[in-house]
Amino acid sequence: MSRVSRARSAGFVALLGAGLLVSSLEAQGYRLRLDARAQAVAYRGVRADSVLFADVVVGPTGGYQTADGFFVHCQSGARHCSFYRPGPYLQGGPLVTSADLTLWGLGINGLSVRVNARAGADLGDSDVWPGTEPPIQLMEAYADYASRRVTGRLGRQLLVSRLGIIGFDGGRAIIRSQQLGLEADGYLGYGLARATALPVSSSAINPLDEFQPRSRQLLAGGGLGWAGRYGQARLEYQREVDRDSRQFGSERVALSGELRPFTRWTVTGGVEYDLANTWFGNADVSLRYTTAAVTALVGARQYRPHFDLWTIWGAFSPVPYHAVNASVWVRPVARLELRGRGERYAYSPTETSTPLVDVDDDGWRLGVGASFSPNAVWTLDAGYREEYGPGASSDGFEASISAVPLAQLTLTAYGATLDRPLEFRFEEAGVDVLGLDAEWRPSDRLRLTLGGAHYREDRRRPDVSGIDWSQTRLNAGATLFLGSGADRSRLPRALRTRPPAGTR
């Protein structure tokens, strides 16, 4: 696909949104958001190379390397050894355009329609930017009917729950009882791949190869929630079924809740259970205390990655890690905030042995920072973070200065450092970042952004493979908000979905 055709594809969503806007002028109300973002970046690539095993030499550290100093990887019994050389500079130019349209006042009280789509293209010569295929993606497109007791939704939609974010094409229904504070919902449809708006059978997900399902999975689930004066709770169930094999792709249940026993105190928590693998997934509990001067939080959590049963990753039996953490925000004066956070974690036993090496199974992370606003124009922020874990560690500083010289203009300068020594690699990479951003709002309907950043990377290696991956990125964006006269008029009274305080 040529750059011209890719640019045309990227503009398709904007034209589609404009066309839908014109066709909806007879409706009582609409709201349209058009957003375009572009970036230009150049960075060093790499190319694979090989050398005969007979031509390698032993380097000063005892490993094999080429005659000109590149470390190589030699498999037992192989005639050739592989390594990477610096490649040509690659030019990337991602352009993303999105349109988000909502229509209402369609002749039925409570009926609305929403369409959210995006187009992406790589205008660079190398065509290497990920996420630009397919060029057109439909994120959401559904009709929604809402009343005081019932809500129904039909079409492509994103479901956000304790079990994660997943998209599907189908229907969802919600029933409420204000007197009891209860809400029940159920949904059914054809699921999308996780973290994408594409079917799991799409050719764009071809790295799955022979493990890729040939048909879209069937997604079904539901939930029951309660909300009252002192808290809320929700129970959820979700399953995915492979339509070809008739086998479960996943089956999980989750329970989450929030308790407000006293003023300023909040307890939140949740747990997930994988019925297919018969183990507990993510779980967490936290206690928060909030005042005007201090906010403090302590908590504990378990993290275990979730993989669908049809993938190969579940065969590795991922073990969870358990962590305890604490955070605090202190505001001694009105314009100053101090913050700090720390966490300690440890992995469960993996039931494997490493007789030739000792491997850590625990780690910690911490961060401190401060934000200061001497007046309404300037805001200064700085922080330090450090982390040490199995196989790697990192530490670095970050700082930013923001200025609002005009109500419509915001300027930001920022910088950061990151050092990342790796236990099982040769290099100890370091990255320094300097950048500038500007945002101009000439009206309440238009927002323009412009920025640039330089990333300087130092890959400290004992051989000549310390490839310079420094790069400069430039970005620009525009966001346009459009709406009908009904959109600018006074909003109707909100639909209450929770019982009034004190009714329970």
Regions flagged by a language model, labelled:
Residues 2-14:
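Bacterial N-terminal signal peptides that target proteins for export
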Residues 28-504:
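Gram-negative and organellar
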Residues 11-23:
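Bacterial N-terminal signal peptides
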